[in-house]
Amino acid sequence: MATVIPGDLSEVRDTQKVPSGKRKRGETKPRKNFPCQLCDKAFNSVEKLKVHSYSHTGERPYKCIQQDCTKAFVSKYKLQRHMATHSPEKTHKCNYCEKMFHRKDHLKNHLHTHDPNKETFKCEECGKNYNTKLGFKRHLALHAATSGDLTCKVCLQTFESTGVLLEHLKSHAGKSSGGVKEKKHQCEHCDRRFYTRKDVRRHMVVHTGRKDFLCQYCAQRFGRKDHLTRHMKKSHNQELLKVKTEPVDFLDPFTCNVSVPIKDELLPVMSLPSSELLSKPFTNTLQLNLYNTPFQSMQSSGSAHQMITTLPLGMTCPIDMDTVHPSHHLSFKYPFSSTSYAISIPEKEQPLKGEIESYLMELQGGVPSSSQDSQASSSSKLGLDPQIGSLDDGAGDLSLSKSSISISDPLNTPALDFSQLFNFIPLNGPPYNPLSVGSLGMSYSQEEAHSSVSQLPPQTQDLQDPANTIGLGSLHSLSAAFTSSLSTSTTLPRFHQAFQ
C-alpha cells in the first residue's frame, strides 16, 4: 500500500481544486511574474509579455490579408478586430440615431454623445457646440490665438505659443499633468510627435500628398477620411438626406397598378431611344405586343372592363380601374361595341414572332365567311353616315402622333428586318375599331370619305427604299392589304395616305 505523508496532503488538495471563474474578495490579483527586460513593466503571462516586446522592436507579425490594406498588428485579436472593418455588414447599432458601427468599442464611444446629463458648451462667436469642457476651452483658445492673445482665460497666465497654451488648458479640465500621455511617436519627416501610430499615419498625407478618399458627388479628393466626412456633411448634406429617405427597391417606371396619368407614364418611355427600348429587358407585368388594342373588353357577365394603356411599340401595362384615381380616368369618345376585338396577352417569355403568329391564328379563326362578309358590308353601308359624322367631330383631335413617328424612324435600319414575319398576314382582318388605332390617329373630312369608299385601290406597292425594311413602307402595304380586303366595310377611308 502506498503511504501518504500528512504534510503533502494540502498540496494534493490544492492541485485537485477546480479553478473557478471569479475570484473571491479575499483573493489578490495574479502576480505579474514576467517583467520586461527593457522597461519597468511586468505582465502575468508570457503571451502578454511577447506582445509588449513588439512595442520595443517595432515588429508587427499579424498583417491584414486585404489587397489594398497595409496595416499590421502585434496580436491576433487586434487583427481579427480590424478585419471587421473590411466587412460591409455593421452589426453594432445605436438605439438613439440608428447609426451602425463595425466594432462594439466604437459604438460605446459614440453613445457618449447621447448622454442626456452631459451639458453642451456653445461658442458665442461662431456658434459651435462642444460636449466636453476641454474641447470648448481649446476652441476659445484658438479664437484668442488667432487674434494674437495667448493668455489663459481661467488663470490669466500668458504663454509663448498656442501649443503650450493648449497643454496648459488640460490642467484646468481636471486632468493632472502626470496623467497626460507622452507623445512618443515621432514623424520621420518632421519634428512633430503624436500619441499613437494611427495619428502618425494620418499625418503622413501632409508629406506624401496622397489623396485616396474621393467624394462621390463632386469628385473632390481628400487625404484623410475625416476630412471627406466633414466635406460630405458640409457641402452635400441634402444628397445624404435624400439617400437615407429613398427606399431600397426603386419603383420601376412601368410598374402596374399605380394611379398615374397616362401622359406621365409615357414620358420615361418617350425619352428613351428605340434601340434602348428594344434592348431593355421587360418586367413580368410588361409585355411586348405590337398588335394590342388599347382597351380590352371583358365578358358581358357584369365584369368590369380592364384598361390597358397603349405605350409606344405596343407596350401595355394593365391597370385596374378601381386603383386609378378619379381625376385620371379617361373620357372615352367612342363607346365599346362589337368591333372591340379582344386579344389575349401572350405568355411572359414568348418571343416576338410567336406573338404575331398567335395573333394571326386568332384573326383567321374569327373571320366570318364570304356570305357573311357581303351581309356585313351591306349593313355597314347603312350605318356609315352616323359613324363618319361622329368621326368628323374629332377630326381635330385625331392626328399622326409625334411619338409614333419619332419611334419608328430609328427602326428603319437593315438590322431590323421583319419582312418575313409579315408574309403570312391574312387578307381578311377584323372590322375596324377607331379605338384600336392607339396612338396612330388620322383626320379626314366627310366629303373625302364618300369618294374614297368607292375609289379604293386594290393594292399599293411598298415604298422602294433599301434602307427602310420595316417602317412606313411595310406599314403602308399592310394597311393596303386590309383596306382592299374589306372593300366598302367600316374601314377608315384613305388609311394608306396617312403613311405616305
Curated annotation (Swiss-Prot):
Q: What is known of its domains?
A: C2H2-type zinc fingers 3 interacts with DNA-binding site G-clusterinc fingers. C2H2-type zinc fingers 6 and 7 interact with DNA-binding site core sequence.
The tissues in which it is expressed are:
Expressed in fetal tissues such as lung, liver and kidney. Not detected or weak detection in normal adult tissues, but highly expressed in salivary gland with benign or malignant pleiomorphic adenomas with or without 8q12 aberrations, with preferential occurrence in benign tumors.
Record localization: Nucleus
Tell me the outcome of changing residue 340 to A: No effect on transcription activation capacity
Q: What is the lineage of its organism?
A: Eukaryota, Metazoa, Chordata, Craniata, Vertebrata
Quaternary data = Interacts with KPNA2, which escorts protein to the nucleus via interaction with nuclear localization signal. Interacts with E3 SUMO-protein ligase PIAS1, PIAS2 and PIAS4.
Show the segment(s) annotated as Activates transcription.
243-500
What's the name of the protein?
Answer: Zinc finger protein PLAG1
- Where do the record's region annotations for Interaction with KPNA2 lie? 2-84
Query: Could you say which disease the record links this protein to?
Result: Silver-Russell syndrome 4: A form of Silver-Russell syndrome, a clinically heterogeneous condition characterized by severe intrauterine growth retardation, poor postnatal growth, craniofacial features such as a triangular shaped face and a broad forehead, body asymmetry, and a variety of minor malformations. The phenotypic expression changes during childhood and adolescence, with the facial features and asymmetry usually becoming more subtle with age. SRS4 inheritance is autosomal dominant. A chromosomal aberration involving PLAG1 is found in salivary gland pleiomorphic adenomas, the most common benign epithelial tumors of the salivary gland. Translocation t(3;8)(p21;q12) with constitutively expressed beta-catenin/CTNNB1. Fusion occurs in the 5'-regulatory regions, leading to promoter swapping between the 2 genes and activation of PLAG1 expression in adenomas. The chimeric transcript is formed by fusion of CTNNB1 exon 1 to PLAG1 exon 3. Reciprocal fusion transcript consisting of PLAG1 exon 1 and CTNNB1 exon 2-16 is also revealed in some adenomas.
Q: What is the effect of changing residue 227 to A?
A: Prevents formation of functional zinc-finger 7 and inhibits DNA binding; No proliferation and transformation of cultured cells
**Encoding gene (name):** PLAG1
Q: Which UniProt keywords apply?
A: Acetylation, Activator, Chromosomal rearrangement, DNA-binding, Dwarfism, Isopeptide bond, Metal-binding, Nucleus, Proto-oncogene, Repeat, Transcription, Transcription regulation, Ubl conjugation, Zinc, Zinc-finger
- Function in brief: Transcription factor whose activation results in up-regulation of target genes, such as IGFII, leading to uncontrolled cell proliferation: when overexpressed in cultured cells, higher proliferation rate and transformation are observed. Other target genes such as CRLF1, CRABP2, CRIP2, PIGF are strongly induced in cells with PLAG1 induction. Proto-oncogene whose ectopic expression can trigger the development of pleomorphic adenomas of the salivary gland and lipoblastomas.
